[in-house]
């Protein structure tokens, strides 16, 4: 007579899984807050797509990053009910 006993003193093989990995965050979002002073070329907002549109004195890079074209004060504004834009207004010295 053949008996097959399993005495759970060791873990059996764990097997494998298709899950269990993740990618690092892309550090998107606001880099210069409303009312802050920026220099020309400063990144204001990093995004994928156009969540926020460029306004006065703000350019849009190839990856949709918004940056200041001139030195000044950052101002986030509404465009109607749902859209938003960011502008940079020069400071009078």
UniProtKB/Swiss-Prot annotation:
Alphabetical UniProt keywords: Ribonucleoprotein, Ribosomal protein
PTM description: The N-terminus is cleaved by ribosomal processing cysteine protease Prp.
Keyword Ribonucleoprotein attached: yes
Positions of the propeptide removed during maturation: 1-8
Disulfide topology: none
One GO biological process term: translation
Domain of life of the native organism: Bacteria
Keyword Ribonucleoprotein: yes
MF term (GO), any: structural constituent of ribosome
Entries under InterPro entries matching the protein: Ribosomal_bL27, Ribosomal_bL27_CS
Pfam family name, one: Ribosomal_L27
GO-annotated cellular components: cytosolic large ribosomal subunit
Location of the region described as Disordered in the Swiss-Prot/TrEMBL record: 8-29
Family as reported in the entry's similarity comment: Belongs to the bacterial ribosomal protein bL27 family.
Record protein name field: Large ribosomal subunit protein bL27
Species annotation: Limosilactobacillus reuteri (strain DSM 20016) (Lactobacillus reuteri)
Originating gene: rpmA
């Amino acid at each position: 007579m053949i008996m097959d006993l399993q005495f759970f003193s060791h873990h059996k093989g764990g097997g494998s899984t298709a899950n269990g990995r993740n990618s690092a965050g892309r550090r998107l979002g606001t880099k210069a807050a409303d009312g802050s002073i920026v220099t020309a070329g400063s990144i204001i907002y990093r995004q994928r797509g156009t969540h926020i549109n460029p306004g006065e004195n703000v350019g849009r890079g190839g990856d949709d990053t918004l940056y200041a074209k001139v030195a000044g004060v950052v101002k986030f504004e509404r465009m109607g009910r749902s859209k938003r834009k960011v502008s940079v207004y020069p400071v009078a010295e």
